[in-house]
Structures are given as structure tokens and as C-alpha cells.
From Swiss-Prot:
An individual GO BP term: lipopolysaccharide core region biosynthetic process
GO CC, one annotated term: plasma membrane
Source lineage: Bacteria, Pseudomonadati, Thermodesulfobacteriota, Desulfuromonadia, Geobacterales
HAMAP family in the cross-refs: LpxK
Residues reported to bind ATP: T67, L68, G69, G70, T71, G72, K73, T74
Organism, scientific name: Geobacter sp. (strain M21)
Keyword terms, alphabetized: ATP-binding, Kinase, Lipid A biosynthesis, Lipid biosynthesis, Lipid metabolism, Nucleotide-binding, Transferase
Described function: Transfers the gamma-phosphate of ATP to the 4'-position of a tetraacyldisaccharide 1-phosphate intermediate (termed DS-1-P) to form tetraacyldisaccharide 1,4'-bis-phosphate (lipid IVA).
Name of the protein in question: Tetraacyldisaccharide 4'-kinase
UniProt record similarity statement: Belongs to the LpxK family.
Length: 375
């Protein structure tokens, strides 16, 4: 399966030039046409009210993207949640719970004080958010409206954050944030299955704010064609902490040491590159599929590679770390890199959030058959 995924990725990136490859790519591009058309009709159906969408009685902030792979949604959600909690608000994240055994089912993952469901059931990202942001409530469910209703009944939040919500048009939002990777905002600019776009580029019109992620401080993305408010952010790796608990470690403390890194995230190469930019000497790396459910086979592979590479230290991501607790004794010392989001244009997003909180008044809970016009 991994080899097949790699092949299609090479096709989309133009790294395969044989006649069979060109034929396969032509087939993918042909298949993308009805897919893109269906997505346009779907969006039009929600916008016109033909397909019903529902509104929660508290403000909803959606954070999402239009491309496959990681654009930094989790650190962005964590930043927004921390900001709102700092303003004294009770915040609940609504997530699907990708990768968990209960994916799509209604679950209260965190009540803001306690983690009630583990990553095996709830998925890695909901549990990571619950642990990373003190006071954050997290609810999972395929139907985010129903998840929001459950949160209202049990947790009484003041505001919702819809995680990975750009395509979840069934739930109306009051602020629609679209994340674009500064390095390659629209991938190869083709829709699935011929490219990385989850829907046509025109979907950007639904966004209230475009947030470019993984920018460099000196970078200036081309914003003129967007005709949308936009701001920039960058990801910072701020040292690491032992998985087993203990004092944090600066990356400079690893200078000159043989290290290996492993990760099961959407963009493992970006994580490995980030470590090397911080001066970590990576002698080997191991990439698993996104949302990997770690078991004995995966842990054995990590340990074999550590031994073969004679690595003194192992480093992984926060997202992986939430799933490694059962294997701490086998793994020994593993360092967890701390990833934070730095907003280069923070006042613009803060102003939008503050305006939403000021204007956001409680609304009556609408019945599910209501079809309002704003999606």
C-alpha cells in the first residue's frame, strides 16, 4: 500500500515520465473532472439551501484546508483555543477523530479537566489537543452538528472550533479560516485523484481569512489574487521533553549526538527537516503512515532501526507521543519535539476573534431540518 501511495504521489509531482505513467496520469486527470464537478454542485447545494445545513446556538470557528496532507491545522486550533481560553471563554473543539477505533462516533474526549477517552478510541489529534491546551473541551463525531449539541448539553461551551471543517458544510460557521501551506499553497493545482486538492481552487471564496502556514519571517506570499484577508504563520520546534516525563531539553543539548527520528504524520519529511534545521544530527529516520496505530510490529521496527543506526537518542512528534504510552518500557528514553505556532500577523486574526466574541450572542438551537442559507 505504501509503495502504491508513493507511486501516485510521484505521478502527481511529475516524477514519472514513462508512457505507462503518462497514460495513468491521463486517466487520473479524466477521473478528476466529474469529481470536481460533483464537489461544485455540492457546495452550490449547501450555499443555496437545497442541501440543509444547521447552526449551533454559539459561535463556530472553522479551521480547515483544501489540500491533502498536513497544513498545520492542529497547532492552529491549539493557538486559537489558547487565545479564547485566555479571554475567559469555555471552548470546545469538534473533531471527527481520525484514526481512532471509534472514528465518527459521538464521544466526549475531554471535559476540560480530564481526558475521558484515549487515542486508541478517539484518535491522536483530539487527545493531543486536549493535553496541549489546558481547559479545552474536545468532542468527536462524524456529524459535527450532533457533536456540538452533545457538547451544549454536557459541557456548556461559549464557543466552538470546528477542526478540519472547511468541507464539512453541514455545520454553519461564523468564521471560516482556510489554511494554505506557504511552500505550495495548492499542491499541483489539480483536484483528486490527479492532484492534492480536495476541492477546486474556487472554494477559497468561502473563506473569511486565509492563513498561510510554514512561512519564513521574510516570506511574502502572493496575496493580490486572493482578494481575501490573509496572514502568515510559521511553525517553531521549541526543544523537546522526555516521553516518560522530566526536564525539557534544548536541541542544542543534542548537538553532536547520533539521533534518529520517527513520525506517523501527514508530512514526516517536514518534521525531519525541521529537526535538522535546529542542529539535530539525524543519522536515520522512519516514516509511518498518518494516524498510525502503534503496535508491537511498529515498535519493533523503531528499535531495530535504532540499534542498526547506533543512535543515542530518539525523537518523535507530539502527535505520535500520545499513542506511545503503552510502549514506554520497551522504547526507553524518547524525546518529544514541541511544536508551536507563531503568528506573524497576529493582530488581524485576534481582531476577527475579538469581534466574533463581542457579536456572538446565544441563539436558539435550531431543529436539524432547518436549512439556512449561509454555509
Amino acid at each position: 500500500m505504501a509503495d502504491l501511495e508513493s507511486y501516485f504521489k510521484d505521478l502527481m509531482d511529475g516524477k514519472r515520465a514513462g508512457w505507462k505513467d503518462r497514460l495513468a496520469l491521463a486517466g487520473l486527470r479524466l477521473a478528476s473532472l466529474p469529481y470536481a464537478l460533483a464537489l461544485r454542485f455540492r457546495a452550490l447545494g449547501y450555499a443555496s439551501g437545497i442541501i440543509p445545513s444547521h447552526r449551533l446556538p454559539r459561535p463556530v470557528i472553522s479551521v480547515g484546508n483544501v489540500t491533502l496532507g498536513g497544513t498545520g491545522k492542529t497547532p492552529t486550533v491549539a493557538w486559537i483555543a489558547s487565545y479564547l481560553i485566555g479571554r475567559g471563554k469555555r471552548v470546545a473543539v469538534l473533531s471527527r477523530g481520525y484514526g481512532g477505533s471509534a472514528e465518527g462516533r459521538l464521544r466526549i474526549v475531554s471535559d476540560g479537566n480530564n481526558l475521558l477517552v484515549g487515542p486508541e478510541e478517539a484518535g491522536d489529534e483530539p487527545c493531543l489537543l486536549a493535553r496541549k491546551v489546558p481547559g479545552l473541551m474536545v468532542v468527536t463525531g462524524a456529524d459535527r452538528y450532533r457533536a456540538g449539541v452533545l457538547a451544549l448539553k454536557k459541557l456548556n461551551p461559549d464557543v466552538f472550533i470546528l477542526d478540519d471543517g472547511f468541507q464539512h458544510l453541514k455545520l454553519k460557521r461564523d468564521l471560516n479560516l482556510l489554511l494554505l501551506d506557504c511552500r505550495r499553497p495548492f499542491g499541483n493545482e489539480r483536484v483528486l485523484p490527479a492532484g492534492y486538492l480536495r476541492e477546486p481552487k474556487g472554494a477559497i471564496e468561502r473563506a473569511d481569512l486565509v492563513l498561510f502556514t510554514r512561512c519564513q519571517p521574510e516570506s511574502a506570499p502572493q496575496l493580490a489574487d486572493l482578494a481575501k484577508p490573509a496572514c502568515r504563520s510559521l511553525h517553531r520546534l521549541n526543544g523537546c521533553v522526555p516521553l516518560q516525563g522530566g526536564e525539557p531539553l534544548a536541541f542544542s543539548d543534542l548537538k553532536g549526538e547520533r539521533c534518529m527520528a520517527f513520525a506517523g504524520i501527514a508530512d514526516p519529511a517536514g518534521f525531519f527537516d525541521g529537526l535538522e534545521k535546529e542542529g539535530v544530527q539525524l543519522v536515520t529516520t522512519l516514516a509511518f503512515s498518518d494516524h498510525i496505530c502503534y503496535g508491537d510490529a511498529e515498535i519493533a521496527a523503531v528499535l531495530r532501526l535504532k540499534k542498526a543506526s547506533r543512535s543515542a537518542f530518539m525523537v518523535t512528534t507530539e502527535k505520535d507521543a500520545v499513542k506511545l504510552a503503552p510502549f514506554m518500557d520497551q522504547l526507553g528514553t524518547v524525546y518529544v519535539a514541541q511544536l508551536d505556532l507563531e503568528l506573524l500577523d497576529a493582530p488581524l486574526l485576534q481582531e476577527m476573534l475579538d469581534r466574533l466574541l463581542t457579536a456572538g450572542k446565544a441563539r436558539p438551537l435550531q431543529p436539524e431540518n432547518d436549512g439556512n442559507k449561509r454555509a
